[in-house]
Swiss-Prot record:
Coiled coil: none
Pfam families recorded: Glyco_tran_28_C, Glyco_transf_28
Keyword Phosphoprotein included in the entry's annotation: no
Subcellular location field: Cell inner membrane
Name under which the protein is recorded: UDP-N-acetylglucosamine--N-acetylmuramyl-(pentapeptide) pyrophosphoryl-undecaprenol N-acetylglucosamine transferase
GO CC terms in record: plasma membrane
Source species: Shewanella sp. (strain ANA-3)
Length: 362
């Protein structure tokens, strides 16, 4: 189906969990002949990332207010009104047929501006607990979409999964490689790393290696490379460990791994399901409304992951879980299959089709 000449304004920013699913939808619609424009903020990751994918981006001046000081909260209403007017000007100039909000600071003013301009508004919530912006906008949106069931309680929402890259969906369909003797553990802590993983894993590997052959690919985050490498060396474990500040090729990392130790961001959970990998999930304890714990439950309840809250995490618990998986490769394989079984593989197409249908209705 082609829709040459149709226009969409995509609103997403702040974190990869918002931006990457939105990019998947934007790329899909661009391939259908749509014109795509982005609305974001100049000081967050979308300002750098979106132009790299070939999309034009407009900026509005807006910041979050949750947990900020009194002065900022008092000034917030005036700044919100200004940002709505800025978004309305973008809409008036671009004339989109539909507006898609996928989270981040710009989505709030942009969503209100879309409603004021009479442009159909579609929302997509990636997390199991909706963010404040989507919770408010859900009452005025034409269509509310979500990745997980029971996300919204006050409005009717359609469960469509999280849009992810096609390469990862294809990876999940590949035949699994025969397991080596060594358990291959991928440790991912996000762009800044996870201090708890960086602190514990050198000791975990040292303890495990006395009983079990293990190799580790550990993404430690910005400015943590030297310290974590040194910690592995002090434990005599530098030989079987690949320590990296960032992992640019997550497809290669997922293909390599037998099991993943990571946080439970919405995109991470959806990617683990799509590629069919078992995991040990340690939700970020300071996430708003503890939404990462709810995200994790999707895989935990399917029998595809173990949940270890950070408050109780220690070397012994990690050693115990990894030893269990190393000793039972059949269970490891079954956990991976259970992960794949709960994956929603056509989320990108579902979100795009909702946008297409609303644009055609006018």
């Amino acid at each position: 189906m082609t829709d040459a000449g149709k226009r969409i304004l995509v609103m997403a920013g702040g974190t990869g969990g918002h931006v990457f699913p939105a990019l998947a939808v934007a790329k899909y619609l661009a391939q259908q002949g749509w014109q795509v424009r982005w609305l974001g903020t100049a000081d967050r990751m979308e300002a750098r990332l979106v132009p790299q994918y070939g999309f034009d981006i407009d900026f509005i001046d807006i910041k979050g207010v949750r947990g900020n000081g009194l002065v900022r909260k008092l000034a917030a209403p005036f700044k919100v009104v200004r940002s709505i007017l800025q978004a309305k000007a973008v809409i008036a100039e671009f004339k989109p047929d539909v507006v898609l909000g996928m989270g981040g600071f710009a989505s709030g003013p942009g969503g209100v501006a879309a409603k004021l301009a009479g442009v159909p508004l579609v929302l997509h919530e990636q997390n199991a607990i909706p963010g404040m912006t989507n919770k408010l906008l859900s009452r005025i949106a034409n269509q509310v979409l979500c990745a997980f069931k029971n996300t919204f309680t006050q409005v009717k929402a359609k469960v469509v999964g999280n849009p992810i890259r096609r390469e990862l969906i294809a990876l999940g369909a590949e035949p699994k490689q025969a397991a080596d003797d060594a358990l291959k553990v991928l440790v991912v802590g996000g762009s800044l790393g996870a201090k708890v993983f960086n602190d514990l894993m050198p000791e975990v590997v040292a303890a495990l290696s006395k009983q079990q052959s293990i190799t580790v690919w550990h993404q430690v985050g910005k400015d943590n490379l030297t310290g974590v490498k040194s910690a592995y060396q002090q434990q005599g474990q530098e030989g079987g460990v690949n320590v990296a500040e960032f992992i640019d090729d997550m497809e290669a990392a997922y293909r390599w791994a037998d099991v993943v130790l990571c946080r439970a961001g919405a995109l991470t959970v959806s990617e683990l399901a799509a590629v069919g990998l078992p995991s040990i999930l340690v939700p970020y304890p300071h996430a708003v409304d503890d939404h990462q714990t709810r995200n994790a439950q999707v895989l935990v309840e399917a029998g595809a992951a173990f949940l270890l809250p950070q408050a109780i995490l220690d070397v012994n618990k990690l050693v115990s879980k990894l030893q269990l998986l190393a000793n039972d490769r059949a269970e490891l394989a079954q956990m991976g299959q259970r992960a794949r079984d709960v994956a929603v593989l056509d989320a990108t197409e579902q979100v795009a089709q909702v946008c297409i249908a609303l644009a055609e209705k006018g």
